[in-house]
């Protein structure tokens, strides 16, 4: 992920 919002992931 990009470091925004909730939840798992990169």
Swiss-Prot record:
Its main location: secreted. Keywords: Antimicrobial, Carbohydrate metabolism, Chitin degradation, Fungicide, Glycosidase, Hydrolase, Polysaccharide degradation, Secreted. Optimum temperature is 50 degrees Celsius. Retains only 60% and 25% activity after incubation at 30 degrees Celsius and 60 degrees Celsius for 1 hour, respectively. GO terms for biological process: chitin catabolic process; defense response to fungus; killing of cells of another organism; polysaccharide catabolic process. It comes from the Bacteria. Signal peptide: none annotated. Inhibited by Hg(2+) and, to a lesser extent, by Ag(+). Hardly or not at all affected by Fe(3+), Mg(2+), Co(2+), Zn(2+), Ca(2+), K(+), EDTA, beta-mercaptoethanol and N-acetylglucosamine. The keyword Secreted applies. It catalyses: Random endo-hydrolysis of N-acetyl-beta-D-glucosaminide (1->4)-beta-linkages in chitin and chitodextrins. GO terms for molecular function: endochitinase activity. Has antifungal activity. Inhibits mycelial growth of wood rotting fungi P.chrysosporium MTCC 787, S.commune ITCC 3751, G.trabeum MTCC 355, P.agaricans ITCC 761, C.versicolor MTCC 138, P.versicolor ITCC 13, P.placenta MTCC 144 and P.friabilis ITCC 335. This is Chitinase.
């Amino acid at each position: 992920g990009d470091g925004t919002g909730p939840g798992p992931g990169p």
